[in-house]
Design a protein with these regions (language model features):
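Expand to "…catalyze enediolate/carbanion chemistry for C-C bond making/breaking, isomerization
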Residues: 2-533
Length: 533
């Protein structure tokens, strides 16, 4: 392989091949990736254009709603193809980036599934993406190990968790690979390489190539994925439905199309997941032009609020009607070494997971192995001897309306909340552009979704000239003043050495740009990616 393409349909790689690349970017793997890019990039580009058009319609007054043209799919009696036996019990899933030590610890945790993440908890610099593929290949083969500087060795225990790979969203490019002069979709890069290197070993041990699909906004995007999966199955002579996917419902448009998404992916889908933090971010972003739909402090927007509880219940009802799993959302808490503080953390996790389990969710997400026992105990109590709650149909529920899904929750906009948003967003952006996408901040394991909520909340308050609870109007000038003040707080909290050696000035500049721009920037990871190696 050369770095430059020699024909119009070859892929060009901007990085030279080292030892790591040679393991993953083999001639056969690149040939398969090239086929996918050639076949599916044009339609992916049309889907991204459709997102822009849909947002323009919403901005102009057309609120999201259930689609009248697809009512026949919602009304018809059909089910998904089925769920493999090793995915029938997903009561606790742990998520984390594809870094070697984290992969081992997650697979060894007291959980049923590990979602290995190339998306929101990974800052996708080239080396991390390639190393991530190597780490997952070694995990699938059972050969993965890691030793730290102190000589401690990490390796897999018997019967590790089931592995699911989350690929990047449709909007994210892989800038180190181009096709016809354009960057290729990161989603196809992640999918092609994980599938190609692992499908045989996964099937041989009774599992399969399983994926999580993020940031979907329409059933047409789900149909695109179904075509990608079917192409891969046909290419390698695999039965239809070998590839399985769980799709995150984490955008406001998608919540109105859950039946249609399940139907479009019915050969491959096994469930939907409540991606709650990105859903809140999407709510703000999608309804950004509506002054009557502004959310309060991030800390006040919890899953017991009516619009989020409606989303959870509708997802359960829709999934179980179609024989699909309804997965609960993320508990981002980190256990504390302080016993009293840790008890508070575990009680919050218990309450959160109890709400999900009692609503009828089949399982839930955690971000730290230290929460596994608590989450597991909650679901064990509810499930008893059952593997899941597919029989919980919620047929007694009144129909959930578009108005319920779109109604904002009450709560204050406080100066303390705004300042906390600034500190969290700046610290997260600094970590992300430094190559770390999964960051402990103030006792929570944060990924991109939290920073997205933080910066879009402030943008929305500025845009609609909202007032804080202490009477201060939220303006660009107030934000810039607070940003300067909170940078000093961050410096004092972290210490001069960490602060001066970090990229906090770059992070503050990016935060300032995306929070004060007249047009809301779609994803902070897009301009952030330009600052990443």
């Amino acid at each position: 392989m050369t770095e430059q393409a020699t024909t119009i349909d070859e892929l060009a790689f901007t990085r030279p091949y080292g030892e790591q690349e040679k393991q993953i970017l083999t001639a056969e793997a690149v040939e398969f990736l090239t086929e996918l890019v050639t076949h599916f990039t044009p339609q992916r580009n049309k889907l991204l254009a459709a997102r822009i058009q849909q947002q323009q319609d919403i901005d102009n007054g057309m609120l999201p709603d259930f689609i009248s043209e697809t009512a026949s799919i919602r009304d018809a009696d059909w089910k998904i193809r089925g769920i493999p036996s090793d995915l029938e019990d997903r009561r606790v899933e742990i998520t984390g980036p594809v870094e070697r030590k984290m992969v081992i610890n997650a697979l060894n945790a007291n959980v049923k599934v590990f979602m290995a993440d190339f998306e929101d908890s990974l800052a996708p610099d080239w080396n991390k993406v390639i190393d991530g593929q190597i780490n997952l290949r070694d995990a699938v083969n059972g050969t993965i190990s890691y030793s730290n500087e102190a000589g401690k060795i990490y390796q897999l225990k018997p019967n590790p968790a089931v592995l699911i790979c989350r690929v990047r969203g449709l909007h994210l490019p892989e800038k180190h690979v181009t096709w016809r002069g354009e960057t290729i979709p990161g989603s196809l890069f992640d999918f092609a390489l994980y599938f190609f290197h692992n499908y045989q070993a996964l099937l041989a041990k009774g599992s399969g190539p399983y994926f999580y699909l993020p940031k979907t906004q329409s059933w047409q995007e789900a149909a695109w994925w179904s075509e990608v999966f079917s192409y891969a199955e046909d290419r390698f002579n695999l039965p239809r439905g070998t590839i399985k996917a769980t799709l995150l419902i984490e955008t406001l448009p998608a919540v109105f199309q859950m039946d249609e998404i399940l139907h479009a992916l019915r050969d491959h889908i096994v469930g939907l997941n409540c991606g709650r933090w990105d859903y809140i971010f999407s709510y703000i972003k999608t309804l950004k032009n509506y002054p009557d739909r502004v959310l309060p402090d991030r800390q006040a927007v919890t899953m017991d609020k009516p619009f989020l509880n409606a989303y959870s219940r509708l997802l359960i009802k829709t999934c179980h009607k179609r024989g699909a799993f309804a997965m609960g959302g993320m508990a981002a808490f980190i256990p504390s070494k302080d016993e009293e503080r840790n008890n508070q953390v575990l009680n919050k996790v218990k309450a959160d997971k109890s709400l999900e389990a009692n609503n009828g969710h089949d399982g839930t997400w955690i971000a730290h192995p230290g929460l596994a026992d608590t989450a597991m105990a909650v679901f064990n109590d509810i499930l008893g001897s059952r593997k899941n709650q597919l029989e919980v149909m919620r047929e007694q529920d009144a129909p959930i309306t578009a108005d319920q899904l779109l109604a904002p929750c009450d709560g204050e906009r406080t100066e303390e909340g705004m300042r906390a948003n600034i500190r969290v967003a700046v610290q997260y952006i600094e970590a992300w552009i430094s190559g770390n996408g999964c960051v402990p901040i103030y006792g929570l394991m944060e990924d991109a979704a939290t920073a997205e909520i933080s910066r879009t909340s402030i943008w929305q308050w500025i845009h609609h000239q909202k007032t804080l609870s202490n009477g201060k109007p939220v303006t660009k000038a107030l934000f810039r003043q607070m940003l300067g003040e909170e940078m000093k707080v961050i410096a004092s909290e972290l210490g001069e050495e960490r602060f001066s050696h970090g990229r906090f000035d770059d992070a503050a500049r990016l935060m300032e740009q995306i929070t004060t721009s007249d047009e809301l920037i779609d994803f902070l990871t897009l301009p952030g990616y330009r600052l990443l190696a």
